[in-house]
Amino acid sequence: MALSFFSGGGSASHAKYFDIRLDEDYIVFRGGEQEAASAHLSGKLLLCLSEPLSIKHIRLHLTGISRVCWHLPSSSAGGGRKSWRERVIYEKTWRFRDPGKGKTEILPAGNYEYPFNLVLEGNMPESIEGLSDTYITYRFKAEIGRKYAKDIIVRKPLRIIRTLEPSALELAHAMSVENIWPNKIEYSISTPTKAVIFGTSIRVDFKLIPLLKGLTIGQIVSQLIESHDLTLNPEDPDSIRNTYKNTRTILNDEFELDHDNALEIIDEAAEGYQFSRYLDLPKTLTRCLQDTDTKGIKVRHKLKFRVQLMNPDGHISELRATLPVSIFISPNLAIDENNNLVDQTPQSAQRAINDIAQQAPPLYGEHQFDQLYSELDPNGYRTPGPGSGPGTPFGTLSRNLSAENLASMNALTNTDISASALHSRLSNLSNLNITRPHQPSPTDHESQNDSEHRRLGVPADYFGPSSGSNSHSPSSPVLSRRPSDEVDHEHVPSGMATPFHPQYAEVETLSRVPSYSTAVRTTKTFPFRHLSSHLSKPISEMLGADLANSSLPWIFFIIGRALVTLTPLVTMMKTEDCDSFKLGLESRIRTEAASPA
């Protein structure tokens, strides 16, 4: 690099090249000061020596300065009063070479490279440049200290940009003002978004519908107004007395309608004017700043509209409206050291607009500066864990087959089923699914039926070949259901375990119908333990000896038992209803018994 970088002396024979080179031309914060993530600043300090050089130190400084100033004119000829305040808002120093106080060292000829990096917090004030006496700037200053000669110094500005996130509401919400001036005009003035990129253009959509016959639209004026609110001591609660406000017009657009060609039908009901205007923003920060509010510098923008209405009687009315606008700097439009856009073509502005509209989320590798939740234990949230293998564990190594942390799960569950019971059921279910089902042979099936008969107290030949049991194939698998006995039912409250149900094989045995000959010969008590105690009485006691010894069909035997079973239920009915019900049923049974079989 040429020696024009140097200020403060030096000769070409001592330093051939000395420069500050940044990896990125500017730092970008996305979002406000309270929500933006940190940013990484990195670069190198390059030094090239053609001959040895005696130095005291090599240092690099980064300094941020805030200055607020305004000039109040005076009525006297002596001028006005000037109020200002300047302060350092950021400082950072890198010491690459430092032999010690009062000492020097000699650098041999050659090339030297000193890397540096820094993490900048997201709440740092952004760069504000463009006003003459009010600004926030960041500058690098690299110096080579020498004992008997002037220091070699090189400077480089750093621009910090605060832009909007792609999900910001200013980019999604349209701004509009619409109303009806009675007996005058119905109007609607809108912009597609509130936020506008610096250096591009603002599209304004107009819809004007005259409501008075003979009323015509005159000149339409659109203005972009920039307001400045400056405060010397923003952190001082009494700083209202040290505040200065000022406004300036950024652009002015005047337009007149072509009444012969611009009139069209709007909303299928009325005739009016519908058109758009594009307001081109300046390409330099000296004429237009970005919206900001930091360190006592507040900048805002708004659009002001004036529409002349030519009344039929000759007088002129004026429609006035205002819309807020937010201007922000896009990192896709580079700004040089003189605060001008590097590329001022319409194509570059359109590319910046498209990039904002189609911006993707940040890359995975750019998450290292994201703010983490405090007071959150990261154990259990890292995948894989410290002791985890590269693959899914098998068998008992898996968490879903382990019994760890069941006590805490019992405290977290909101249901009546304990976590230990659920774990046991899932484990048994997994074992049942893994085990190959056994297909019983006919011999196994017969032996199982005999054991069921003995357990129920039923004779083995009670269901003979003529009974309904022959409808089941001996080779068909026996239906079974494992009772929920993994928990102690006596010590578990109601609802904590599945109720006990009889085995499917037992129910199947009870549902079989015996043969006719077996039914008429049977007068003993059948100890079916799951039936009501009323069914344990002999037939002679329930229906009488004559009816019991007669050759009744089995269906009447079932009806008689049902009569005795329903006796406790019908006691809730009236006495005469119960008597008539019993007499009618007994009369029908005797009639059927007297008829020939």
Swiss-Prot record:
Sequence similarity: Belongs to the arrestin family.
Annotated GO molecular function terms are: protein-macromolecule adaptor activity; ubiquitin protein ligase binding
- Compositionally skewed regions (Low complexity) per UniProt: 465-481
List, as start-end ranges, the regions of compositional bias called Basic and acidic residues: 443-455, 482-492
One Pfam family of this chain? Arrestin_C
Disordered: region residues: 375-398, 432-499
Query: Quaternary structure?
Result: Interacts with hulA.
The yes or no answer to whether the keyword Nucleotide-binding is present is no
Instruction: Answer whether the UniProt record assigns the keyword Nucleus to this protein.
Output: no
Know the name of this protein?
Probable HECT-type ubiquitin ligase-interacting protein creD
> So what does this one do?
Component of the regulatory network controlling carbon source utilization through ubiquitination and deubiquitination involving creA, creB, creC, creD and acrB. May be involved in signaling by recognizing appropriately phosphorylated substrates via its arrestin domains and then recruit a HECT-type ubiquitin ligase such as hulA, leading to ubiquitination of the substrate, providing a link between ubiquitination and phosphorylation in protein regulation and stability.
Q: Name one GO cellular component term.
A: plasma membrane
GO BP term, pick one: ubiquitin-dependent endocytosis
User: What's in the keyword line of the UniProt record?
Assistant: Ubl conjugation pathway
